[in-house]
Amino acid sequence: MLTVISPAKRLDWAKRELATTAPDFMDDAVTLARAAKRLSQADLRKLMDISADLAKLNADRFKVFEEAPEGERPAALAFAGDTYIGLEATSLDADTMDYAQDHLRILSGLYGLLRPLDAIRPYRLEMGSRLKTRKGPSLYAYWGPRLAQALNVQAKAVDTKTLINCASVEYFSAVDEKALDLDIVTPQFFEDKPGGPKIVSFFAKKARGAMARFVQERRLTSPHQILDFDTGGYSHAPDLSAPGKPAFLRSEAAQKAA
């Protein structure tokens, strides 16, 4: 199976002694970085609803994107958000990382689609950004059906018809489902609360990363196998599930123990 996850806003730029690969859409990343480079700090601040300090940081990054003075890092280890706490890519063994190179993809506003070891440069460009290009008024328009098509090609290469979607709605919306020839399975993660089961953003993001790791480590090949997911105290919750959306629930006791 293929699994997709979102990137992260935060980066960990610690140097890693790992061989990297070249992103498939590097030319597009340069094109988009040039478009972002033309924007003022105020424009970037408005584009991504970020602070003045973050706008300056990313304006400076886009100015030197092609020179890459800060070097490059493997994507799965450079991203440092909630999903990546769950993924824990730094502790994956070499064989599992090799497997993930073929079976795990990271959706990206700038790079389109990344393998775990693809080399990235420091950036922030969220998929929902309305960055105008010759292809349209947003990154969704820019990428069009190409990310779905790339997933189709990779799915064929690993002989699967299933895509495990562990990405956010914002990022998975960049995958044109009409162009996707795969069955989509989107796990949902709930916390048991006094008022009933509830999706809590931080925990759900972390669980999506943990699910991505679970699929890679166990080399899962069928969607029913993900129902055994138990990382962090979650268990399959049939009553909360829907077709294509298996649910997992964590009890209050498991929450406290985590």
From Swiss-Prot:
GO terms for biological process: response to hydroperoxide. It comes from the Bacteria. Pfam families: H2O2_YaaD (PF03883). One of its GO terms (cellular component) is cytosol. InterPro entries: YaaA. Transmembrane segments: none annotated. Belongs to the UPF0246 family. This is UPF0246 protein Jann_0444. It comes from Jannaschia sp. (strain CCS1).
